[in-house]
Amino acid sequence: PLYVRPEIIPEYADLDVYERSQARSARAQAAADVEAIDRDRSWNAKLPVLEAVHALGLEGSRELSYQAFRRLRGTRLGDLATWCALTEVYGNDWRTWPEEYQRPSNRAVSEFVRAHEERVDFFMWLQWIADQQLSAAQSAGRDAGMSLGLMCDMAVGVSGAGADAWMLGKLFACLLYTSPSPRDKR
C-alpha cells in the first residue's frame, strides 16, 4: 500500500476541498527536503488520506468489484489485513505480541477481528486498491510497447517477524542465520 496513489482512486474525487488540500499539503511535506525516499514519512503522509477515502465507502460496480476481490483472495487476504491491524496495536514483530495473538487461528484473533472489523476492512481495501493500480500500470506499460509490461521482483525469503511467517508459520523454517540476497547477474 505504500506505493498506492490516493489521487487516482476514483472515490478521492468525492473528498471535500479541505480534505484534498490537506492531502496535497501532506504529499508536498513528505517529499520536501528529502534526498532519499523516506518510506515512513511517505506512509504517514498517505495514511490519513487513504483512511478518508476508505471512509467514503463504495457504490455499485466498485463495491461488487471489491467483494469479488475479497472472495477471490479469501482467507489469506483476511489474515494479512488482520496482521496489519494487529501491528498497529502490538508492533511489527508478531513474535513479541501477547501469545493469544501469535497464531491467526487463535480465538483471540477472531475476537480481535470482530472488535476491529472496520480497520481490518481498511487493510483489505488497501490491497484491492494496490492490485487495481498495479494492473493499470501493467496495462499502461503493455500499451506503451513494453512487451513484458512491468517486471516484478520476487523476494528470496521472508522476515520471521512479518505477515508471511505469522500466517504460514508452520510452513516456514525460520533460520537464525540470514544473509543478504544474491546479486543480480547481468
What residue ranges belong to the model's regions?
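Conserved small/polar residues in nucleotide/adenosyl-binding loops
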Residues: 17, 177-184
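Acidic/aromatic-lined carbohydrate-recognition and catalytic surfaces
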Residues: 1-169
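Basic side chains
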Residues: 46, 185-186
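Extended hydrophobic/aromatic segments used for targeting, binding, or gating
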Residues: 165-179
